[in-house]
């Protein structure tokens, strides 16, 4: 993009970007030094406004539909040109960054933003390389123009805003949106398309590693505990949201964290609490009159966020990489109160539950979501971000689990003793005790009890956890009502899974309706 008429700031520092954001009225400084920015009416992702350009090089490999909406190449060219013209006289911020902390599987990306705080977000969440693009790969381009207003009749969009990915031209266009999470999820979608062709499984998961080099992965939708549980004071963080699993190891796709802030406390989440300081972007967080963030305030949105670089975490894996995982945890938030707090899965059950992605939308990251909690099935624990058919990712997961011998667990961070509104949610200390037992290997080869309707193996004891909690029927006062809810959940699983073409071994690994 030309910089003759406008001022362009290349690879600006954190301090410069904070100064620019404050001078330009884009945000305010909090008492803890973070920058607060508001995103207007769109306080989450806009899935109805996300498109992929339908062109010959990638069209046959994409699962088109409501998640991956098609956009015409000609319409994209016109809209890209109009956005470039709109930005031609604007002050801009540009950085050369990378996505993928692996010397073979990274993607170089040039990020151009209209807002200073969006550039700070990109530099926090993507990777700032010591040497840009060492392998001289073709460079992706992101343009983020939040003040551009799309016109559906002219631009071919669904509303006044759009997120459009173009694999042939290696371009990502964000127009009319202030919510910064769209930038990170766009490049995640890019890697989710590119990595399988390289034999790498892209994953919507967090990852950490112990002192002995043992890696654990945590899959789950927003709000199920990925970030909280991976930020473990006893372990070293690899990353909190996006990873690749290649033969030989896992790597972070990002260079930062995007942690949910609602009800954040120093006691329960000390690692995240301490990471929020100068350089952090707080999105839609409300402050009091003394500029102290009020993390309990959801008046703007439940989806309040902190975006900070991994350098803000003391206990982290500095190269953002780890060995192949000994333990893989699927986090589910069960609103029916039926699932046990932990189950031990066979590889066929792992494939079944990976494809199912059963959980709940808790403080959903999508616009239009309310604080109401509803159950959902999200393929691969991240359906909105995976362009290829689900089977591609499930096959890669099975291959990686089989070749390395990883043990997979299903951990319920949702309700017990009754559904949401009647039962109570598992507290963080209980889930942490379960995770501690998983990562220490204490749940390998233990005695289990089989839950027939759910078709799950549940350990009879977990160190530090009340034994009565382990079999969910024990926590319900009305046992007949539990059986009824369990049957309903099994039927929901079976109905959802009918769309998948899989082996009988995988299909039979699910609940028994």
Swiss-Prot record:
It comes from Shewanella sp. (strain ANA-3). Coiled coil: none annotated. It catalyses: oxaloacetate + ATP = phosphoenolpyruvate + ADP + CO2. It comes from the Bacteria. The gene is pckA. Belongs to the phosphoenolpyruvate carboxykinase (ATP) family. Pathway: Carbohydrate biosynthesis; gluconeogenesis. SUPFAM superfamilies: PEP carboxykinase N-terminal domain, PEP carboxykinase-like. It holds the Pfam family PEPCK_ATP. GO terms for cellular component: cytosol. This is Phosphoenolpyruvate carboxykinase (ATP).
């Amino acid at each position: 993009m030309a910089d003759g008429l406008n001022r362009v700031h290349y690879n600006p520092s954190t301090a410069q970007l904070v100064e620019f954001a404050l001078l330009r009225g884009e945000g305010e400084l909090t008492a803890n030094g973070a920058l607060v920015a508001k995103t207007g009416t769109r306080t989450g992702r806009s899935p109805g406004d996300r498109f992929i350009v339908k062109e010959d090089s990638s069209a046959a490999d994409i699962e088109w539909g409501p998640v991956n909406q098609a956009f015409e190449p000609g319409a994209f060219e016109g809209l890209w040109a109009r956005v470039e013209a709109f930005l031609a006289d604007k002050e801009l911020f540009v950085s050369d960054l990378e996505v993928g902390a692996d010397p073979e599987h990274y993607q170089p990306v040039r990020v151009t933003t209209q807002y200073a705080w969006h550039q700070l977000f990109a530099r926090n969440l993507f990777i700032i390389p010591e040497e840009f693009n060492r392998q001289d790969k073709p460079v992706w381009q992101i343009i983020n123009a939040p003040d551009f207003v799309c016109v559906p009749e002219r631009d071919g969009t669904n509303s006044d805003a759009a997120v459009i990915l173009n694999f042939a031209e290696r371009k990502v266009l964000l127009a009319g949106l202030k919510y910064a999470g769209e930038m990170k999820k766009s490049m995640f979608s890019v890697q989710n398309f590119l990595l399988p062709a390289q034999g790498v499984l892209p994953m919507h998961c967090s990852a950490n590693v112990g002192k002995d080099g043992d890696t654990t992965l945590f899959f789950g939708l927003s709000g199920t505990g990925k970030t909280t549980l991976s930020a473990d004071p006893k372990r070293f963080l690899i990353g909190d949201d996006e990873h690749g699993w290649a033969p030989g190891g896992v790597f972070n796709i990002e260079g930062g964290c995007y942690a949910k802030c609602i009800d954040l406390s120093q006691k329960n989440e000390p690692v995240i609490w301490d990471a929020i300081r100068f350089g952090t972007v707080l999105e839609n967080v409300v402050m009091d009159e003394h500029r102290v963030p009020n993390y309990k305030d959801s008046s703007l949105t439940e989806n309040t966020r902190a975006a900070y670089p991994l350098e803000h975490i003391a206990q982290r894996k500095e190269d953002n990489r780890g060995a192949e995982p000994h333990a893989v945890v699927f986090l589910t938030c069960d609103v029916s109160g039926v699932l046990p707090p932990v189950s031990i899965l066979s590889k066929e059950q792992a494939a079944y539950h990976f494809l199912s992605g059963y959980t709940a939308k808790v403080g959903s990251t999508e616009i239009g979501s309310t604080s109401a909690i509803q159950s959902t099935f999200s393929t691969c624990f991240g359906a909105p971000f995976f362009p290829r058919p689900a089977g591609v990712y499930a096959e890669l997961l099975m291959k990686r689990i089989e070749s390395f011998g990883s043990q997979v667990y299903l951990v319920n961070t949702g309700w017990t003793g009754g559904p949401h509104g009647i039962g109570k949610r598992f507290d963080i200390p209980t889930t942490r005790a379960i995770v501690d037992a998983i990562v220490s290997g204490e749940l390998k080869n233990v005695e289990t009890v089989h839950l027939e309707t759910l078709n799950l193996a549940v350990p009879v004891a977990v160190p530090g956890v009340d034994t009565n909690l382990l079999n969910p029927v024990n926590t319900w006062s009305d046992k007949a009502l539990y059986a009824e809810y369990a049957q309903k959940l099994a039927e929901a699983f079976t109905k959802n899974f009918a769309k998948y073409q899989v082996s009988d071994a995988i299909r039979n690994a699910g609940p028994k309706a």
